[in-house]
Amino acid sequence: MGALTKAEMAERLYEELGLNKREAKELVELFFEEIRHALEENEQVKLSGFGNFDLRDKRQRPGRNPKTGEEIPITARRVVTFRPGQKLKARVEAYAGTKP
């Protein structure tokens, strides 16, 4: 099973909507750029029927070097999280186990 890429998304827009390939590629890039920009501005991204992208601050915490066992601090950082919406969860769960 492969992964859906931005190029494949653009190809599907080209095929399904009749956009030319350049327009389809620009549309996909613009969509993701808007998500990136909103997150950079510390905004939550809510895609109805799909899910939410949020920013979460993680505190500094103790870690360990796996090779030496030495304790080292893991620095505080901000991470992007995704929570799938109920409709997406239901669709994925409906298809679970139907494909080899």
Swiss-Prot record:
Gene3D superfamilies tied to this protein: IHF-like DNA-binding proteins
Any one Gene Ontology BP term: DNA recombination
Keyword Iron: no
Pfam family, one: Bac_DNA_binding
Any one GO MF annotation of this record: structural constituent of chromatin
GO CC annotations on file: cytosol; protein-DNA complex
InterPro entries to which the protein is assigned, alphabetical: Hist_DNA-bd, Histone-like_DNA-bd_CS, IHF-like_DNA-bd_dom_sf, IHF_alpha
Alphabetized UniProt keyword annotations: DNA recombination, DNA-binding, Transcription, Transcription regulation, Translation regulation
Location of the region described as Disordered in the Swiss-Prot/TrEMBL record: 53-72
Coiled coil: none
Transmembrane segments: none
Keyword field contains DNA-binding: yes
Self-association state and partner proteins as the record states: Heterodimer of an alpha and a beta chain.
Family: Belongs to the bacterial histone-like protein family.
Primary role: This protein is one of the two subunits of integration host factor, a specific DNA-binding protein that functions in genetic recombination as well as in transcriptional and translational control.
HAMAP family assigned: IHF_alpha
Protein name (Swiss-Prot/TrEMBL): Integration host factor subunit alpha
Organism, as annotated: Pseudomonas putida (strain ATCC 47054 / DSM 6125 / CFBP 8728 / NCIMB 11950 / KT2440)
Taxonomic lineage: Bacteria, Pseudomonadati, Pseudomonadota, Gammaproteobacteria, Pseudomonadales
